[in-house]
Amino acid sequence: MKLPIYLDYSATTPVDPRVAEKMMQFLTMDGTFGNPASRSHRFGWQAEEAVDIARNQVADLIGADPREIVFTSGATESDNLAIKGAANFYQKKGKHIITSKTEHKAVLDTCRQLEREGFEVTYLAPQSNGIIDLKELEAAMRDDTILVSIMHVNNEIGVVQDIATIGEMCRARGIIYHVDATQSVGKLPIDLTQLKVDLMSFTGHKIYGPKGIGALYVRRKPRIRIEAQMHGGGHERGMRSGTLPVHQIVGMGEAYRIAKEEMASEMERLRGLRNRLWNGIKDIEEVYLNGDLEQGVPTILNVSFNYVEGESLIMALKDLAVSSGSACTSASLEPSYVLRALGMNDELAHSSIRFSLGRFTTEEEIDYTIELVRKSIGRLRDLSPLWEMFKQGVDLTTIEWAHH
């Protein structure tokens, strides 16, 4: 077993060796290096064929038509293109958008930008387990609502939203539904022939593909229109200009192909490992599970250890690559906005750790993690005056702390 142990698969994944090998064939003079938009020679035709194959592989995993797949630079761009693109195109119908407080920043900050441009956004607060109350969503829908954006799987706590029902609600009212599926693709079955989802964002690097490549699904029937955000040569049916990075697209295609083949057995294996991890630490005193094991994806376990500072715990666990919150916000010392939206107090939110498991996680690593966490929590609490007061029965919520 090699240290440190990587348990931050929700931040990014290593490229699968099979994917890397495939990508290498599309870089040098010996390989297929042409521009897929070059229509006048074989170098371009071969590159275009490789892109077509990858587009089919991506579409296959999610039950889409390959013509509904638009390649982008990643899920952040896909979220921007979907939300700004749809809002700009349909703004004559209305200027109201609904999303939730626990979305990824790529959705929240895009909505904030639209607010500056005159759109109105309703931010729904989830229930304490992270799931959106569909009655609240329904109550928020108005005649001028043009877009709902609610993610499939939350990147911090792993809870799964009921996107099928939300899709039905939106379709019945003629509202466009966008889903950020960054954390669910390759982990949960997605069938867009059945789901009434109009726009869906994906990435490559969360499922063992390369970074810097993603896709946006844009439904053809009924046809969804979006306004391009990147202008130029009119690539990707005019929705996203820019020379296609063939090696990255091929990598993403191969990653999606592998996911389709291995997803069912791999998720079963990871569910076992996640449960093993939780069973190994759940009897620690004052430990709280954030999210919902029943309605959660098997790759994420988010736990708060009361009376332990999250940052000091991460330092104590230096042999484990884990995070508190998401990578995108891990540079700030603010407690996780996702956990606070669940109604959690700052102290508990601050003491949270996200363990995310993946393809190369082993049972041995999980057992080592359990042992290390138990030891570290014990040691840090021994040093904590708050823990001592708690053990003596002091109600810490009643204490007036002096400001200095």
From Swiss-Prot:
<keyword id="KW-0963">Cytoplasm</keyword>
<keyword id="KW-0408">Iron</keyword>
<feature type="binding site">
    <location>
        <position position="155"/>
    </location>
    <ligand>
        <name>pyridoxal 5'-phosphate</name>
    </ligand>
</feature>
<feature type="binding site">
    <location>
        <position position="243"/>
    </location>
    <ligand>
        <name>pyridoxal 5'-phosphate</name>
    </ligand>
</feature>
<dbReference type="GO" id="GO:0030170">
    <property type="term" value="F:pyridoxal phosphate binding"/>
</dbReference>
<feature type="binding site">
    <location>
        <position position="183"/>
    </location>
    <ligand>
        <name>pyridoxal 5'-phosphate</name>
    </ligand>
</feature>
<feature type="binding site">
    <location>
        <begin position="75"/>
        <end position="76"/>
    </location>
    <ligand>
        <name>pyridoxal 5'-phosphate</name>
    </ligand>
</feature>
<dbReference type="Pfam" id="PF00266">
    <property type="entry name" value="Aminotran_5"/>
</dbReference>
<dbReference type="GO" id="GO:0051537">
    <property type="term" value="F:2 iron, 2 sulfur cluster binding"/>
</dbReference>
<feature type="active site" description="Cysteine persulfide intermediate">
    <location>
        <position position="328"/>
    </location>
</feature>
<feature type="binding site">
    <location>
        <begin position="203"/>
        <end position="205"/>
    </location>
    <ligand>
        <name>pyridoxal 5'-phosphate</name>
    </ligand>
</feature>
<dbReference type="InterPro" id="IPR000192">
    <property type="entry name" value="Aminotrans_V_dom"/>
</dbReference>
<dbReference type="InterPro" id="IPR015424">
    <property type="entry name" value="PyrdxlP-dep_Trfase"/>
</dbReference>
<feature type="modified residue" description="N6-(pyridoxal phosphate)lysine">
    <location>
        <position position="206"/>
    </location>
</feature>
<protein>
    <recommendedName>
        <fullName>Cysteine desulfurase IscS</fullName>
        <ecNumber>2.8.1.7</ecNumber>
    </recommendedName>
</protein>
<dbReference type="InterPro" id="IPR010240">
    <property type="entry name" value="Cys_deSase_IscS"/>
</dbReference>
<dbReference type="InterPro" id="IPR015422">
    <property type="entry name" value="PyrdxlP-dep_Trfase_small"/>
</dbReference>
<keyword id="KW-0411">Iron-sulfur</keyword>
<comment type="similarity">
    <text>Belongs to the class-V pyridoxal-phosphate-dependent aminotransferase family. NifS/IscS subfamily.</text>
</comment>
<dbReference type="GO" id="GO:0044571">
    <property type="term" value="P:[2Fe-2S] cluster assembly"/>
</dbReference>
<keyword id="KW-0479">Metal-binding</keyword>
<dbReference type="GO" id="GO:1990221">
    <property type="term" value="C:L-cysteine desulfurase complex"/>
</dbReference>
<comment type="subunit">
    <text>Homodimer. Forms a heterotetramer with IscU, interacts with other sulfur acceptors.</text>
</comment>
<dbReference type="InterPro" id="IPR016454">
    <property type="entry name" value="Cysteine_dSase"/>
</dbReference>
<dbReference type="InterPro" id="IPR020578">
    <property type="entry name" value="Aminotrans_V_PyrdxlP_BS"/>
</dbReference>
<keyword id="KW-0663">Pyridoxal phosphate</keyword>
<dbReference type="InterPro" id="IPR015421">
    <property type="entry name" value="PyrdxlP-dep_Trfase_major"/>
</dbReference>
<feature type="binding site" description="via persulfide group">
    <location>
        <position position="328"/>
    </location>
    <ligand>
        <name>[2Fe-2S] cluster</name>
    </ligand>
</feature>
<keyword id="KW-0808">Transferase</keyword>
<dbReference type="GO" id="GO:0046872">
    <property type="term" value="F:metal ion binding"/>
</dbReference>
<dbReference type="GO" id="GO:0031071">
    <property type="term" value="F:cysteine desulfurase activity"/>
</dbReference>
<keyword id="KW-0001">2Fe-2S</keyword>
<comment type="function">
    <text>Master enzyme that delivers sulfur to a number of partners involved in Fe-S cluster assembly, tRNA modification or cofactor biosynthesis. Catalyzes the removal of elemental sulfur atoms from cysteine to produce alanine. Functions as a sulfur delivery protein for Fe-S cluster synthesis onto IscU, an Fe-S scaffold assembly protein, as well as other S acceptor proteins.</text>
</comment>
<comment type="pathway">
    <text>Cofactor biosynthesis; iron-sulfur cluster biosynthesis.</text>
</comment>
